[in-house]
């Protein structure tokens, strides 16, 4: 079950591979995500010192958040992957012009996971082509409905 989706990622990038990563979250962040108070549209993934971090995601704290903790909604969050997956991703990101983008947050066994995609940026003409295909599919569906 998906908590938050990043639909903009599919419009801006060609997603070639997907990986599921664990997230290092604080308690108030998990509660806020359960309430649906997160946004990953502007988020991106970076590699630092052979570790992978999620930057730019916004998780708004609940008003009932603890009083002794100052919540930071846009803090950097560490992603948890196997070492060989990290090495593979580092190699592709550094050599072949790929980037890593967060695709969604979802639950797996009661824990919050982040699906990240190994992606290449689309050019403007690719985006237009995608839009034309989507419009044509809608038009075909409309024609088929009216014909029957």
Swiss-Prot record:
Chain residue ranges for the region called Disordered: 123-148
Gene Ontology CC annotation, any one: cytosol
Biased amino acid composition, Basic and acidic residues: 126-142
Compartments where located: Cytoplasm
GO biological process: trans-translation
An MF annotation (GO) of this entry: RNA binding
Keywords: Cytoplasm, RNA-binding
Primary location group: cytoplasm
UniProt xrefs under Pfam families: SmpB (PF01668)
Function statement: Required for rescue of stalled ribosomes mediated by trans-translation. Binds to transfer-messenger RNA (tmRNA), required for stable association of tmRNA with ribosomes. tmRNA and SmpB together mimic tRNA shape, replacing the anticodon stem-loop with SmpB. tmRNA is encoded by the ssrA gene; the 2 termini fold to resemble tRNA(Ala) and it encodes a 'tag peptide', a short internal open reading frame. During trans-translation Ala-aminoacylated tmRNA acts like a tRNA, entering the A-site of stalled ribosomes, displacing the stalled mRNA.
Family in the record: Belongs to the SmpB family.
Protein name: SsrA-binding protein
Organism: Burkholderia mallei (strain ATCC 23344)
Name of the gene this protein is made from: smpB
